[in-house]
Amino acid sequence: MKQRVYNIVMGVVKGFLPFYLFTFLPLTSKAQTNEQMGGVYYAYPIESGIEKPQLQSAPEGYKPFYISHYGRHGSRWVTNDNRYIWVNQHFEDQKNLTPLGKSVKKRLDQVWKNAKGNGGKLTALGARQHRGIAKRMYQNFPLLFTADAHITAHSSIVGRCRSSMLAFLGELVTQGCSQKIEAITDSADMAWIAYTSPEEKALENRTNVPLRISPERFIKSLFIDPSKVKEPVKLLLEINTIASDMQDVELGVSLYDIFTPEEMHAAYEKNNRGMTIVHGDVIQNEGIPARCAISLWQRIENDADAAIARGGVGADLRFGHDSNLYRLLTLMGIELRGEEYNYMDEILPMAANLQMVFYRNAQGDVLVQLLLNEKSIGFMSWKELKQQVADRMHYFEHLRQLCALNTMVGTAPANTKTAGLFGKGSEEHGQTLPAVLSPNGQNFWTPQTQDTENKCVAPYYYTDSLFQGIRNSHWIVGGCTQDYGSFTLAALSGKLRLEPEERATPFSHSEEVSHPHYYAVRLPKEHLKLEVTGSSHTAIFRITPEQDSPIHIVLNHNSDEGEGYLEVDTMAKTIYGYNPVHRIYQGWGERAGIDGNYLLQAYDPIKDYGIDSLCVWLTFEGKAFEPIILKAATSFTNKRGAENNFAFEVEGHDFESMMAQTAQQWIDRLHTIDVEDPDTARVNQFYGALYRCSFLPREMSDVDGSYPKFADGTIMPESPRKFYGDFSMWDTYRALHPLYTLIAPKEAGDMMQSLVTMYEEGGWLPIFPCWNSYTAAMIGDHCSAALADAYIKGIRNFDYEKAYEAMRKNAFETPASIEEYANGMGRRALESYLKYGYIPLEDGVREAFHQEEQTSRTLEYAFDDFAVAQLAKALGKEQDYHELMRRSENWRNVINPKTGYCDGRHAPKQLSRKKTDGGLFENNLDFIHRKPYITEGATCHYTWVCTPECGGIGRGFRRQG
């Protein structure tokens, strides 16, 4: 007989009372008897005499006063007569039956003779089961059923549930309960006693757990011409159901002999998996079953609180269904763990029940003992239990919200009215990713439809129709830069194809699932499903073939320069490689001093392997519906860093546990802000935006704090804090970094310290640091703005004195050498800005990727000066403060007084020895189209960029009428 162990973890309530977190752990991996492999059809083992109740003594001083009960109906016939009829139709052609088939027909005929008209009805055994439970409840707690007891009984409107209730109540009377109990069966109660939500129904409809065995042997044993059986898997499962139900109807008919042990276990496993996914506590179901049980729990909680307030003794008895009981256990957090699924014969046999027995002491403290199928799984304070369930309700609502946000926003071309007006080419794409990641983690695990790391090409576009694999990406999300140090993993069947264009395979968005913690896609031509979950430095891939076929895993690093390294260790089943990172903008094409190092670990036997240029492949012997698991780790330091990250972050995880961990990280990040709105689309939009706010900057350091030195690549020693990189500051200083100071202050401080560290290691505060390098990619000096804002907002966990030193250097000094300046150090065109109070059109700003854009630079430098001034004032640098505040008025120098809009302005032209023209404006009257002195936009919106002085700009417009 299968053994069980009940794990009870003790804690303390109110300093002295024991409470218990409930854990129910099977010791064995599969049932040992055919009856147990019936799963939810397993006849209640206590009534059968196979097992015994296990009641635990209450702590000293506590006496029982109330029982809250929810029971599944007892043993029944198969739910519908039509299921018997459908099976029997296959045996009508006796000429097609084997000798065993003819024997089975006789047995099925006998079953049908008794089953006809009884589909779904309670059997005599089912009634006995409930009488037995009632008898033991009465005998264990007789004082709860006295004449003055307050007892209620409710059932689902389904006949077998009401019959179970009547049998239960009848036995209470037999035992001596003198209290008259009304048996209530009301359709209004279905909203809580047997509720199934629309999202739960949808989950049931989309869940299709495969049978992990071929039905071929089974069908051939029964039919001479197996081809006449059109749904062989369904027939095997339906006959298995009838066979399992024989223990519930007591006909003395057995069908177990027609199944092999492997077929029995495969059916058992399929049913367990399906029930676990649809009703259990697994991350894949997005918390839907638990949310479905909330109304039932609320009824239980309200009834219990009423009983406590009322005083006296009593019981609330409820009779429903296995699915509702299972969802209730899920919501309550009663862990019912198996290896990959729960065991329905242990949790939900016929007549399964949860009894919550309430105890009270003289001080009025209330404890609850939980009895699952009449076995104690511990005591807990009622207050603590209510809080635990409330916390779980909160968690499952957050999980729902996490799964509801749309990760695809920004992956298609813009379709707004202004699309194409201010942006062009790649600027008309949102350039986002539907990636799996930890908030601000090192890697984005994203689907790939574009095979390049080149500038302005995101890895994934929604309008593409061919899927190339899952990329480990370091794309600068939302921008037009480059990916770097990446690799892509593809899963194929059939012919081995190495080139990305060759292995590209059709996919449909209807067969994609994309969440921040999980991505999955079905690839119909490959006959497989590919899934990925991940954390900051690591990921787990799960490839599930749909048929027996070799599965090829192709991994390539996406080096457009054709550089890199690959090695395969077949004994250890590992792949290691690195993809060198190259700079763009300043130092275009040069090595950045870092590599994307990665490690891939396989666990299945490798059938074949090979390396071809920048590709490596592993071939496995794929078995239908048996997942192939691969684990990956990365590092920007070296191979050892990747190995350490692997050991710390992923080695001890399975797919589901990592998925759950990453989901929790996202819940923690997103619900630093709780929003409510009757319009759920607006709520989803908000959290989707917050998801996209959590990509950059990324973690560059390893789990031990090691990181590549900025602008150098030398491996720096372990540090207790994270080192961040990829600050696309022109995009993020206005809103993103101020947001971090509010929702993630510790991380905000680490990010600011990372900027200070870059200054210390590189000599200059960077402008737009990406791929661990100086870039000067965009305009402004906005690291200064972010640092000042963090300090003013109360962030102190960074070296703000050193930060001010760096900010002041950028604001007042220009690099002494052209090499430093060309490398991206210092403000662009600072000399012109300081000389004229603006950057004139004559200064072409040649040592920058974005050349010209003089007016925009002036406006942005004025804002940066204002920001640096605020930190100067806070640190007592009065002289600097006054000078910088004077310079912060420079925005006025590029506002054309004739139009009120910003405009291009020339350097002053000498009219005579003592007179200049003061610097003439372009007098532009086209306010809605791009101009070379404006950055990626038009004067109609760039006029407003100097945020602290929007009021002054507005007054200027009013003067223009």
What is each PLM-predicted segment?
Residues 400-737, 741-785, 791-859, 866-893, ...:
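Accessory carbohydrate-recognition regions in carbohydrate-active enzymes
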Residues 15, 66, 314-316, 403, ...:
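A generic hydrophobic-helix recognition signal that picks specific residues
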Residues 290-301, 314, 318-332, 860-899:
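Extracytoplasmic, non-cytosolic globular domains
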Residues 32-152, 156-316, 320-400:
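Signature for phosphate-centric chemistry
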Residues 118, 122, 129-133, 161-168, ...:
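Stable alpha-helical elements in mature extracytoplasmic
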Residues 1-32:
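Bacterial Sec-dependent N-terminal signal peptides
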Residues 22, 71, 319, 408-409, ...:
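Alpha-helical architecture
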